[in-house]
């Protein structure tokens, strides 16, 4: 079987790729199916993967010719992770629409044309919610995105659900909490600070938190996110029924709570490297996101959250070689 990861050069795509190569199979319909080829599609080539099963396709995801290079009749599973992040999609409307919406539709059409109904997993976001939200968002809480990124993700959810209803693909959507702690450098996402205020101080660098200390965030670690992606693709479509979207479990933590966890794990000197200068551009986006949602359905489907944000920090330190 060919497995495709769009956004395969990104940090989550690379972590997923490494896990799939290590496993060597996906359990589909109760049977292990060998991953004979792992195709990574992105605008740049991924680094650090030396495996004969890996095939790299670089190009514009919205180009049908590029998609036809990546998706063929042997493609049994597609992880669609590629996206223009929230802050960038807000700053460049046309780019966000082309990558987050047009490319998603083009991917679905390519799968439809092949006619073999592959499993297709889309990642969505807390950004599909907004406005006046209940303290805990439910699975049936109305979508009301307050950013272009959130709108694009919401439309993608509906498209994948309808392509599944029509039998074109076997789709599933995972609404990811904000992923923290991401490795690497800051990006243009409005939520980038949720990793930076932990990652940079641990590296000896000062970091600013652009939101108020009491701002709540719904968080998930990279390890838990990758495990969720695998569980999501392996779920039988019958278990999802006509509700193809799943709100993943997470941790509800305030910005101040994150720094207190950092203080407990790494000490005062590290935590004191965080400054607090609010930025309206970031707050106007992040402030519309839910602080927590009811994940009972996700838990029943086998998805798991992190035990605590202290453990999230420790896991990041271990992965980054910073553990004491």
UniProtKB/Swiss-Prot annotation:
It catalyses: D-erythronate + NAD(+) = 2-dehydro-D-erythronate + NADH + H(+). GO terms for molecular function: oxidoreductase activity. The active site is at 149 (proton acceptor). It is an enzyme of class 1 (oxidoreductase). InterPro entries: DenD (IPR050005), Epimerase_deHydtase (IPR001509), NAD(P)-bd_dom_sf (IPR036291). NAD(+) binds at residues 125, 149, 153. Its EC number is 1.1.1.410. Signal peptide: none annotated. The keyword Ubl conjugation does not apply. Disruption phenotype: Deletion mutant is unable to use D-erythronate as a carbon source. Keywords: Carbohydrate metabolism, NAD, NADP, Oxidoreductase. It comes from the Bacteria. Catalyzes oxidation of D-erythronate to 2-oxo-tetronate. Can use either NAD(+) or NADP(+) as cosubstrate, with a preference for NAD(+). Belongs to the NAD(P)-dependent epimerase/dehydratase family. PANTHER family: ADP-L-GLYCERO-D-MANNO-HEPTOSE-6-EPIMERASE, NUCLEOSIDE-DIPHOSPHATE-SUGAR EPIMERASE. This is D-erythronate dehydrogenase. It comes from Cupriavidus necator (strain ATCC 17699 / DSM 428 / KCTC 22496 / NCIMB 10442 / H16 / Stanier 337).
């Amino acid at each position: 079987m060919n497995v495709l990861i769009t956004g395969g050069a990104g940090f989550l795509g690379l972590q997923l790729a490494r896990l799939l190569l290590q496993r060597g199979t996906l359990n589909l319909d109760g049977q292990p199916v060998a991953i004979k080829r792992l195709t990574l599609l992105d605008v740049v080539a991924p680094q650090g993967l030396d495996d004969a099963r890996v095939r790299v396709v670089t190009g514009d995801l919205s180009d049908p010719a590029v998609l036809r290079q990546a998706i063929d009749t042997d493609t049994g599973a597609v992880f669609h992770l590629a996206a223009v992040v929230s802050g960038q999609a807000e700053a460049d409307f046309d780019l966000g629409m082309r990558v987050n919406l047009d490319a998603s539709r083009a991917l679905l059409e390519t799968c439809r044309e092949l006619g073999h109904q592959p499993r297709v997993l889309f990642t969505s976001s807390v950004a599909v919610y907004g406005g006046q939200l209940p303290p805990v968002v439910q699975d049936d809480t109305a979508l009301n995105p307050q950013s272009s990124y959130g709108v694009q993700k919401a439309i993608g959810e509906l498209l994948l659900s309808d392509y599944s209803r029509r039998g074109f693909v076997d789709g599933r959507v995972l609404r990811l909490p904000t992923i923290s702690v991401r490795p690497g450098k800051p990006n243009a996402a409005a939520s980038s600070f949720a990793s930076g205020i932990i990652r940079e101080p641990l590296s000896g660098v000062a970091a600013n938190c652009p939101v108020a200390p009491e701002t709540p965030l719904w968080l998930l670690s990279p390890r838990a996110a990758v495990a969720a992606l695998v569980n999501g693709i392996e779920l039988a479509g019958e278990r999802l029924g006509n509700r193809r979207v799943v709100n993943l479990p997470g941790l509800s933590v305030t910005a101040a709570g994150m720094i207190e966890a950092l203080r407990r794990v790494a000490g005062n000197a590290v935590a004191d490297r965080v400054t607090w200068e609010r930025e309206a551009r970031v707050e106007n986006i992040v402030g519309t996101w839910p602080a927590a949602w009811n994940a009972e359905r996700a838990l029943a489907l086998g998805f798991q959250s992190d035990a605590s944000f202290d453990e999230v920090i420790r896991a990041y330190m271990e992965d980054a070689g910073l553990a004491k």
